[in-house]
């Protein structure tokens, strides 16, 4: 039974992780800037083993006090959505740099750390599927769109250096498009947005020409992957992709959602320049290689895309399909 600290704990992935940790009889502290009210993903959680702390990872005194009392630390705090990254690149970078700075200064060898990185660090790397050891190609510094990827990659470098220099047990997971119940469509995630449009009976909007491809990982699979990495010491000091290898174009995704909800709905193609701020750049293909995590832990994703879409739809419609 471990004492676990989860930053970004009220978020989409964090709330699912916390539910699982509590089911496994761990004590959990969630740190998040979100207020504690009925819109919080954890509001209905009732457990004497759970504590919620409203605050920021940039509050060094608060964060360090929570670090020192934890056995396991899950660093999930991040800026969500490409639009928000472009609008606030400095805040985006600070969220990552601040928490890693305090981890490097405070963490001890008796603790274990999971860092939630992102497929964004692969940038413009034109290879498919993407393997963890590839050389990485990011966009030009003048494009604010790359602030998230650069700050996440810097955090990876610092944490892996911490492992090499001080032998702090840690692992890095690069998430690829995690989806599922509780995901907030306000941050621009494509599946909850398309499903919400379909439920409302309005045209489904696809940005660009729709040929860009992605793969989508159910949040329960992502939680399983995190725990499999944290529970296996042979994974320490390395980076692992976490995702699903089932690739689909965004246009075909919209077609699939239309067929699922209402085949009569229109699909509208919208140019990027009509909806995205200056500095946006699209990535045409992003699909993970999952061989490494399977080799080290035996983990592989269980949910197929059709199952994931149904699960998201049930959540959005109040469990009625």
Language model feature labels by segment:
Residues 58, 87, 95-98, 185-189, ...:
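Residue-level signal for the nucleotide or nucleotide-sugar donor/cofactor binding architecture
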Residues 153, 169, 178-192, 202, ...:
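Glycine/proline-rich active-site loop of Rossmann-fold NAD(P)-dependent oxidoreductases
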Residues 222, 226, 242, 253, ...:
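Non-catalytic, hydrophobic alpha-helical segments
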Residues 1-176, 312-315:
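N-terminal Rossmann-like NAD(P)+-binding domain of SDR-like oxidoreductases, especially those catalyzing
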Residues 3, 304-321:
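Amphipathic terminal alpha-helices
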Residues 219, 273-300, 304, 311:
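Conserved C-terminal active-site "lid" loop/helix of NAD(P)H-dependent oxidoreductases
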Residues 17, 226-230, 254-257, 309-316:
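Hydrophobic "lid"/C-terminal helical patch
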Residues 232-277:
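Mid/C-terminal beta-alpha module of Rossmann-like enzyme folds, strongest
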């Amino acid at each position: 039974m471990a004492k676990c600290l989860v930053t970004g704990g009220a978020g989409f992935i964090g709330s699912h992780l916390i539910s699982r940790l509590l089911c496994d009889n761990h004590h959990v502290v969630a740190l998040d800037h979100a207020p504690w009210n009925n819109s919080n993903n954890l509001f209905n959680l009732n457990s004497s083993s759970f504590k919620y702390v409203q605050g920021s990872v940039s509050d060094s005194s608060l964060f360090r006090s929570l670090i020192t009392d934890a056995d396991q630390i899950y660093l999930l705090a991040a800026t969500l959505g490409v639009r928000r990254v472009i609008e606030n690149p400095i805040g985006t970078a600070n969220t990552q740099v601040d928490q890693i700075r305090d981890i490097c200064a405070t963490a001890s060898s008796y603790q274990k750390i999971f860092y939630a990185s992102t497929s964004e660090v692969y940038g413009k790397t034109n290879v498919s599927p993407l393997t963890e050891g590839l050389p990485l190609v990011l966009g030009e510094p003048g494009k604010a769109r790359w602030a998230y990827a650069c700050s996440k990659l810097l955090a990876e470098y610092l944490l892996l250096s911490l492992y090499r220099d001080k032998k702090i047990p840690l692992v890095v997971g690069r998430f690829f498009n995690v989806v599922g119940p509780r995901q907030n469509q306000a941050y621009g995630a494509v599946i909850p947005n398309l499903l919400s449009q379909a439920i409302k009976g309005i045209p489904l909007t696809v940005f660009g020409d729709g040929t860009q491809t992605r793969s989508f990982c159910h949040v329960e699979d992502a939680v399983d992957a995190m725990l499999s990495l944290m529970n296996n010491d042979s994974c320490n000091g390395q980076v692992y992709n976490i995702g699903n290898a089932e690739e689909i174009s965004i246009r075909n995704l919209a077609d699939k959602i239309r067929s699922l909800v209402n085949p009569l709905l229109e699909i509208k193609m919208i140019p990027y320049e009509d909806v995205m701020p200056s500095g946006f750049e699209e990535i045409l293909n992003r699909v993970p290689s999952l061989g490494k995590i399977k080799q080290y832990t035996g983990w592989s994703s269980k949910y197929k895309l059709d199952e994931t879409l149904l699960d998201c739809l049930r959540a959005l419609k109040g469990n009625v399909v």
